[in-house]
């Protein structure tokens, strides 16, 4: 018995040692990660005008109310605001590392209930090699609250739901605590919580004998949390505006684009393909006995596929839950073999640990470069005059471990007003090299410009111009005009842009065969004139819509200025 206890203690020591080492490495990566644009957004009351810093808990309540109405209803963003406005990045680094340790242990528990070092080692390997953009889903303050924290809470909730003790009668206090915890976990982030809800409902539908009264109560409370997020006016507003997915496409194109996006976003993750192949093999194998895979791991993976097909999102971040449940399904399938063969288990542990360090040098190099860039840009903004116009730095080499701040206003300009509020500036923009050369030149910006054949609906933005060797459209605007930072362009014949039938089919399946697209804009003042900068306009653009904020001057006729291409031009 003494020998068995020593062996058990050694195994547990290895398990917690791997978790501890992985957490220390993760803490170092957290320290290298800087504050990002969205983190600055949460330093201010959402949708306040002018932007007002968050200073009290009442400010947080007002901010989250506004956020629910205009953006989304995720509880995860409350955590992001508390860290960004009060606790600070250093406290977040420690808290995020603790959540990461919980994440590793919870994922390991879903793979196998045995406390063996191989499972946290494999989970750490998954994070380093396969997790979608860990710099955005696990290290970035706002992103980690939305994805890693959300999934960690939901994994803990799902494990509690599967605990045999729930089959017995619970006290009213215990039920109350479970309801509150379920609602909170369900309202974190819809791409995570909708997946977990669907997966657990599917599991208990296939295993009805385990669906006790307490389980049904917890599922209902968790579903209420998910519904709170999905029912937020802000979420529906984003959907109506086409912010997250195109809406002006046919039903067939919508369906094909979702399948295409799922397949395309799963390619860098790899694991969804492997898990799907294994699942198909299991289904074929058990078809004769009519015993389909009904484990919670299989149900959660299937649910993740369905939810991603429904949402049809194009960014990598929302696929974090799908990647994690793909890993869990594959590792769980191999767990019985690993548990029964010590030599294989030890070899797998060593291999997983070694593979964890393969991407580390490149990741650390990219993170250090990004940190130096962020610090240099911050110093430049602080030392700049009220109108801060800086040259856009060279685009960094893409890295899964770095959330890019996008210091190029032609690519993204939504952080400008928050930089202004944080650093006390009237304008902050980062100009591409061709525009910056014009800005620093003593000659007028439009001295050799060519006026484009568009008629404007408003004298506040009377005309559009093109400049030689400059990839932009220049629109002189009234200094009192406040734009939203977006413009829409209508394409007269989008099919004509396709150079071949294959390209047209490809655009159709990708959901990009749309005749109306939104673009980022930015503005600056040069020699006393304010200019709005738009992307270059091609001859097939027959209408440009410049979107104006509602508090524009009362003399302006509408909240959109339209430039219409002249007939025959």
What are these regions (language model features)?
Residues 154-174, 210:
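Membrane-interface transmembrane helices that cradle and orient dolichyl/undecaprenyl
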Residues 12-15, 114-123, 171-174, 211-218, ...:
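Membrane-interfacial loop-to-transmembrane alpha-helix junctions, especially the N-terminal start
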Residues 5-71, 81, 85-102, 111-116, ...:
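Intrinsically disordered, polar/acidic, low-complexity terminal segments
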Residues 92-108, 127, 151-154, 327:
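Transmembrane alpha-helical segments of multi-pass membrane glycosylation machinery
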Residues 105-109, 156-163, 199-207, 275-283, ...:
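Transmembrane alpha-helices and membrane-interface helical segments
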Residues 174-175, 336-360:
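Signature aromatic-anchored transmembrane alpha helix within multi-pass, membrane-resident enzymes
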Residues 28-90, 94, 141, 182-302, ...:
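Transmembrane catalytic cores of multi-pass membrane glycosyltransferases
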Residues 74, 119-120, 124-162, 189, ...:
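Membrane-interface micro-motifs in multi-pass membrane enzymes
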């Amino acid at each position: 018995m003494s020998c068995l206890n020593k062996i058990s203690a050694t195994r547990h020591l290895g398990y917690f040692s791997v978790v501890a080492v992985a957490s220390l490495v993760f803490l170092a990566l957290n320290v290298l990660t800087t504050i990002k644009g969205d983190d600055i957004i949460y330093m201010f009351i959402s949708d306040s005008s002018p932007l007002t810093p968050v200073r009290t808990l009442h400010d947080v309540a007002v901010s989250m109310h506004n956020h629910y109405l205009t953006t989304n209803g995720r509880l995860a963003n409350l955590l992001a605001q508390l860290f960004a406005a009060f606790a600070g990045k250093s406290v977040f680094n420690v808290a995020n590392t603790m959540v990461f340790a919980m994440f590793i242990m919870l994922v390991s528990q879903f793979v196998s209930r045995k406390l063996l070092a191989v499972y946290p080692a494999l989970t750490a390997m998954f994070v380093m090699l396969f997790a979608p953009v860990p710099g955005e889903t696990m290290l970035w303050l706002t992103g980690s609250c939305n994805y890693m924290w959300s999934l960690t809470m939901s994994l803990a909730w799902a494990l509690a739901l599967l605990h045999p003790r729930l089959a017995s009668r619970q006290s009213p206090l215990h039920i109350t605590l479970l309801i509150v915890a379920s609602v909170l976990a369900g309202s974190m982030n819809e791409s995570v919580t909708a997946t977990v809800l669907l997966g657990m409902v599917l599991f208990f539908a296939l295993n009805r004998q385990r669906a006790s009264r307490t389980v049904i109560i917890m599922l209902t409370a968790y579903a209420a949390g998910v519904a709170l997020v999905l029912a937020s006016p802000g979420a529906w507003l984003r959907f109506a505006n086409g912010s997250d997915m195109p809406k002006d496409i046919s039903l067939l194109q919508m369906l094909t684009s979702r399948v295409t996006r799922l397949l395309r976003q799963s390619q860098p993750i790899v694991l969804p393909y492997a898990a799907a192949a294994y699942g198909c093999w299991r289904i074929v194998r058990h078809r004769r006995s009519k015993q389909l895979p009904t484990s919670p791991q299989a149900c959660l993976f299937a649910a993740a596929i369905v939810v991603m097909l429904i949402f049809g999102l194009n960014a990598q971040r929302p696929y974090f839950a799908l990647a994690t449940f793909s890993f869990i399904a594959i590792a769980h399938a191999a767990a019985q073999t690993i548990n029964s063969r010590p030599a294989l288990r030890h070899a797998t542990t060593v291999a997983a640990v070694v593979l964890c360090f393969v991407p580390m040098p490149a990741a650390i190099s990219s993170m250090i470069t990004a940190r130096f860039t962020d610090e240099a840009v911050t110093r430049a903004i602080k030392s700049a005059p009220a109108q801060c116009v800086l040259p856009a730095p060279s685009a960094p080499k893409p890295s899964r471990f770095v959330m890019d701040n996008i210091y190029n206003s032609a690519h993204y300009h939504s952080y400008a007003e928050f930089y202004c509020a944080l650093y006390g500036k009237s304008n902050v923009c980062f100009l591409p090299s061709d525009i910056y050369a014009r800005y620093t030149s003593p000659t007028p910006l439009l001295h050799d410009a060519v006026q484009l054949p568009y008629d404007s609906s408003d004298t506040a933005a009377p005309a559009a111009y093109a400049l030689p060797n400059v990839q932009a459209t220049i629109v002189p605007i009234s200094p009192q005009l406040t734009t939203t930072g977006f413009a829409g362009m209508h394409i007269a014949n989008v099919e004509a842009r396709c150079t071949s039938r294959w390209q047209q089919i490809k655009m159709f399946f990708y959901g990009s065969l749309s005749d109306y697209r939104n673009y980022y804009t930015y503005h600056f003042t040069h020699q006393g004139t304010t200019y709005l900068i738009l992307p270059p306009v091609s001859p097939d653009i027959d209408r440009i819509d410049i979107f104006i904020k509602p508090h524009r001057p009362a003399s302006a006729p509408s909240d959109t200025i339209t430039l219409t291409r002249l007939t025959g031009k």
